Amino acid sequence: AILLLVIALFLPETLPPERRRRDGLRQVLGVWRRLLGDGYFMGHALAGGLVIGGMFAYIAGSPFVFMELHGVRAEDYGFYFGANAIGIMLAGQITARLVDRVAPARMLTMALTISAVSGLALLAVTMTGFGGFAAIVATLFVYVSMIGAVMPLTAARAMAPHGAIAGNASALMGTLQFGAGALAGVALGALQDGSALPMALIVAFCGAGGWMVRRLLVK
């Protein structure tokens, strides 16, 4: 609430007055309806949303998996969580450095592929026990780190053709992404069985689903 107040009071509008829009609810819903039928937009928005959903499953499920199942002390859990946050920042910085040399579409394909592979690898090591706790930590680190590449790339690709309605497109994309995160949390609670499998299953589904939905919808 404080941040919203500061933005409202002190962050100036940079868009020239002649380019500003004052759409009512009907116009906004009409724009959203059009965007929901746009395969290019939805392919990128849903891909990003699914990958983010996997991150929400990690956030909700990892305290139980780390501390209850693998004996990580509460004071040490923050180290693992912080390491993943650093991974996100590093992936974001690497993406920014490569954007002038590698096509964004290719980078996004690579990031989504890594997300899918790491999510499926997490499921495999969870089901088999191969590599133990270290393998779970490593695969989660790779998956979560890719958020730093997937989020900016899906947003840029989704909104590139919609500059005239960038605000509405951004709002819809945010709604879809955080809606996917909420659904991932609900699914985790519904599937919880006292093991690490529900978290791994949702992360794997979200990673593979993000890769698949972009491949199917973006032509």
Where are these regions (language model features)?
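C-terminal membrane-cytosol helix-exit motif in multi-pass small-molecule transporters
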Residues: 1-19, 213-214
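Multi-pass alpha-helical transporter architecture, strongest
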Residues: 8, 205-219
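Juxtamembrane intracellular "pre-TM" segments in multi-pass secondary transporters
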Residues: 12-45
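Pair of pore-lining "gating" transmembrane helices in MFS-fold secondary transporters
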Residues: 37-57, 141-145
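Short amphipathic helix-loop junctions that connect adjacent transmembrane helices
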Residues: 60-76
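Helix-to-loop junctions at the C-terminal end of transmembrane segments
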Residues: 91-105
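C-terminal transmembrane helical hairpin of 12-TM major facilitator-type secondary transporters
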Residues: 106-152
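A late C-terminal transmembrane helix in Major Facilitator Superfamily
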Residues: 155-194, 202-203
